Regions:
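Glycine-rich beta-alpha junction loops
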Residues: 1-2, 31-39, 60, 74-77, ...
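Internal gly/pro-rich beta-alpha loop/helix module
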Residues: 1-20, 174
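Metallocofactor- and cofactor-centric catalytic cores in central/energy metabolism, strongly enriched
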Residues: 4-6, 89-92, 104, 115-133, ...
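Structural motif
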Residues: 16-28, 37, 70-72, 107-111, 197-198, 203
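Glycine-rich phosphate/diphosphate-binding loops that line cofactor/substrate pockets in enzymes
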Residues: 22-23, 100-106, 137-141
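Short glycine-cluster motifs
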Residues: 24, 30-97, 102
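Gly-rich Lys/Arg/Thr-decorated short loops/hinges at beta-loop-alpha junctions or inter-strand turns
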Residues: 66-83, 143-146, 162, 196-201
Length: 250
């Protein structure tokens, strides 16, 4: 069961990766409104990138290594004197828009948390911010945005409507944080050139030794295939009585 789930996850990652331009050697930025989601995302990325997780998280910085950053915008540093980013997304939207000029960042990870108390249309405000960032990017410096949506169909914002709004704008919506981390790392990883497979000698032509019916050899010759015919037949034509007589003669 676990192997099946992993296979499905990897298949989804590959499918997304095939539709996105690689951003090899670029950085990953994560701007999360949920502290638990930010911590899990940081741990997953640290594992995939072989980075030692940070023990201390000043200013909500859950991961800060090799240019990659995962930030918990719900940290006290960002919420003193202002509403939580789930309620007021303006700070995150500003940081997203600023990524338009930070071309070293190739992948942006986001969470969309819906429910009572959250802003009325989290996806809509995120899309506006992403479009501001995308407008400053060229085709040679894309910014891929990967998001997870936490909530249900019964929430006021409706999970499926939020997903549709994000996907229509060009945001990649994935099912889980592990899927988001795997896809992000795959996009920034240098593409390995596949080594050519050794050529089978069968592709260089076929030579046949035919034993038995001569008609097989004739058919092969007519097709231009080199063939050597060896005249052979079962002893005594399969007659057991004659076979025993021949054995005695030998």
């Amino acid at each position: 069961d676990e192997a099946g789930r992993l296979a499905c996850l990897l298949a989804r990652v590959v499918r997304h990766q095939e539709n996105l331009t690689a951003v090899a050697d670029k950085h990953i930025r994560g701007l999360y409104t949920g502290g638990t989601l930010a911590a899990e995302s940081a741990g997953l990325l640290a594992e995939r990138l072989n980075i030692t997780p940070d023990e201390h998280h000043p200013q909500g910085m859950m991961l800060n290594a090799l240019g990659h950053q995962i930030v918990d915008l719900g940290d006290d540093f960002y919420t003193v004197g202002r509403p939580h980013p789930m309620i007021d997304p303006s700070l995150r939207n500003q940081l997203i828009a600023e990524l338009g000029e930070q071309t070293q960042v190739g992948v942006l990870l986001l969470d969309v948390v819906i429910g009572y108390g959250a802003t009325a249309d989290p996806a809509g405000s995120l899309v506006e911010a992403c479009r501001l960032a995308w407008a400053l990017r060229s085709e040679s410096h894309p910014l891929h945005v990967i998001a997870t949506v936490t909530g249900t169909e019964n929430d006021p914002q409706c999970r499926s409507r939020q997903i549709a709004e994000l996907e229509d704008a060009g945001v990649v919506v994935v099912d889980s944080l592990p899927e988001a981390a795997l896809l992000a790392v795959a996009l920034i990883s240098p593409q390995r050139m596949a080594e050519p497979a050794p050529r089978s000698s069968l592709l260089d032509g076929v030579a046949v030794i035919n034993a038995g019916l001569r008609s097989f050899a004739i058919d092969l010759q007519s097709a231009g295939t080199p063939v050597v015919h060896y005249q052979w037949a079962p002893i005594a034509g399969g007659n057991k009585k004659l076979a025993r007589l021949l054995e005695r003669l030998q």
